[in-house]
């Protein structure tokens, strides 16, 4: 049987070969007919001046007269790329191209990679703010913590388009979706559930705030990391007030029983553990799981290797186990979230996205599983109906929250999203059939 290390090595070799062959995963093509050079006179100068004049009178006309309505900027500084760490903007580009490809294939969204060479959070905010006119929304990606919290917060406050950090919000959203169905299976209520968030990086900090918005009891939520259980008396609490105020606020609001000491103490009597910690089996010990309540729910989300293998977790008493991997049941995958969420905010021409809309998104995703069981708590990526349904739920939520520039019924938004996604897939199929996209070479 092939080892995980060998499988990863083989995939890396194939990725390098294919990347050299295709030289990029996305491209830009005209979407208008060009029958002769005379057509340039209205697609470009002099006719285009009338279009610019119209937008100058009302900048929202850019959504009607240009591609802004369907354009997303994927912005990164390359400081926390996958499991690679700080590799810089150039080395982040293949990852951002892959993200853009998924945006387009699953959501019909035109996403543009925008790696930027910046060194501090204030410069990042300035550069992103300056680029706002080109895009209908932003997806922030692979930014180190705690810089990512500052950048997201500042851009959400200052910009007039939705700003999303997928490492935070996408992970939190699909985690909540999985927990909704897991709690149904074990017959527990969210307001009664005791939750441990193991790891206090971008994903779990955002998950804590989303669980609060969803109605979980923050006093029954405990955060633990490499320094032990987070509480107001921990030795680093004063410094957190200045270096990571988002984590500091959680230290004050969570852990009603004031558990302290080693992380293992947080597991005792817990109903749920969501781990986004070190990618190393054994990071979570089997005996920690055995101290949890009956019908325990364990999400071990580190990639490429979970913090505890699913079999070990189940043998130790867990009833439901989820990971970030596709070769185990219950993959908690951001790709179930961001294509549909962005399709929705773009269709509504939204000005912002918030935790309430994320709760709506999580409920829409969980609702795709009509009869959840221990091995099926979230949909799979080949559930094609997921994305337009999620988009319509998000778009209509933007309308009800007063964030939308465009107001339609939920059914109309479903029709809009379905048409865009289906049209995009037909265009992609036509490129394949015509040979415009070359067949995949032998691996």
Segments and roles (model prediction):
Residues 1-163, 397, 424-442:
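N-terminal ligand-binding/catalytic initiation module
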Residues 82, 89-107, 165, 173-272, ...:
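Glycine-rich phosphate/diphosphate-binding loop of Rossmann-like nucleotide-binding domains
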